[in-house]
């Protein structure tokens, strides 16, 4: 079997650095047990990944999406419908605890500046320890 080079795959993925990232990601998937889409022919995983990209058995866009998803630490999930349903139901029912929405907005305690300063003066400073 002829060797697979970056030149064989560069027409599928425009940027050679992106190609290396995608092929490396696919090679790691193969080593973790993912199903290969071409004959192995006793090749190593990076070569199989490059052959899959060159023969277009995998979509580079799908590989890129999967790579991005695997690198994300926090995935945001949009659920605006649930929040709007809860708000509309609670406003119709008079609130969760039986209070109206106008009462909930004004339920905060209001303190004067003097009360805040008196509260700050009443705080006790913790003793210094060797923990830090």
Swiss-Prot record:
It comes from the Bacteria. It catalyses: RNA(n) + a ribonucleoside 5'-triphosphate = RNA(n+1) + diphosphate. One of its GO terms (biological process) is DNA-templated transcription. Its EC number is 2.7.7.6. GO terms for molecular function: DNA binding; DNA-directed RNA polymerase activity. NCBIfam families: rpoZ (TIGR00690). This is DNA-directed RNA polymerase subunit omega. The lineage of its organism: Bacteria, Pseudomonadati, Pseudomonadota, Alphaproteobacteria, Hyphomicrobiales.
């Amino acid at each position: 079997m002829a060797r697979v080079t970056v030149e064989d795959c560069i027409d599928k993925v425009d940027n050679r650095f992106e190609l290396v990232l995608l092929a490396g990601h696919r090679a790691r998937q193969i080593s973790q047990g993912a199903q290969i889409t071409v004959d192995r022919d006793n090749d190593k995983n990076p070569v199989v990944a490059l052959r899959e990209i060159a023969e277009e058995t995998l979509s580079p866009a799908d590989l890129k999406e999967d790579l991005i998803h695997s690198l994300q630490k926090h995935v945001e999930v949009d659920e605006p419908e649930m929040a709007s349903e809860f708000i509309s139901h609670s406003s119709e029912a008079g609130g969760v605890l039986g209070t109206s929405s106008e009462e909930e907005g004004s339920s905060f305690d209001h303190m004067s500046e003097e009360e805040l300063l008196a509260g700050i003066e009443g705080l006790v400073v913790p003793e210094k320890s060797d923990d830090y």
